Amino acid sequence: MRAYLYDNLDTDCREPHEQNPSVPVSVEELEASGVLYWRLKDENFEDQIDKICADRNYKNRDQITVSKQGLGELFDAKIKTFFAEHLHEDEEIRAILEGTGYFDIRDKQDRWVRIKVEAGDLIVLPAGIYHRFTLDSNNYLKAMRLFKEDPVWTPLNRPCDEYPYRKAYLNVIEAN
Ligand SMILES: CSCCC(=O)/C(O)=C/O
Ligand SMILES: [Fe+2]
């Protein structure tokens, strides 16, 4: 995982969009926005996932393959939905199994921070954070999705500042 400020250029979102010079964003800075990160080791990948699930009460899991083959005729529509700035009522928890991609999150100053993920990364985006997702130029990512009960990942596109989970998110972040 590597995180940095987005350059805000209006070119293909699958490009890195790293500023020049780059402005790195640390794991601690991500945490200040409520984003959690773990690096999972190959040797005991499943054990580490199981421990995080037990600690954080994630009871269920499934897998998604974000690629033309994996999503079939839904691919173009899904990719568009993922990259529209949105939030969810629930956490978005993804353990990357194969491939690469970018999660962009809005930090406390409402700047886009780009998080490059690869196999072995586990990321938790808190409920209520504005974010988006895109593949990179490899056009392939397979992820495990973790969730507590039935997940509520309906994307609510910005602006939705009046939703209770957005307000709850801002309250937690401001107290940090
Ligand atoms: C890497 S999983 C696909 C992206 C997704 O599920 C989502 O909600 C993006 O915001
Ligand atoms: Fe999302």
Can you annotate each of these PLM segments?
Residues 1-61:
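N-terminal leader/capping segments at the start of a protein or of a new domain
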Residues 63-89:
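Conserved short histidine dyad/triad with adjacent acidic residue
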Residues 79-93, 110-112, 117-119:
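A short beta-loop-beta micro-motif enriched in histidine and acidic residues
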Residues 87-107, 124:
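Short, conserved beta-strand element in jelly-roll/cupin
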Residues 101-102, 110, 122, 130-132, ...:
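Short Gly/Pro-enriched loop/turn and capping motifs at secondary-structure junctions
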Residues 106-108, 128, 136, 146:
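Surface loops and adjacent helix of pleckstrin homology
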Residues 117-137:
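Conserved metal-binding segment of the jelly-roll/cupin
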Residues 134-176:
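Double-stranded beta-helix
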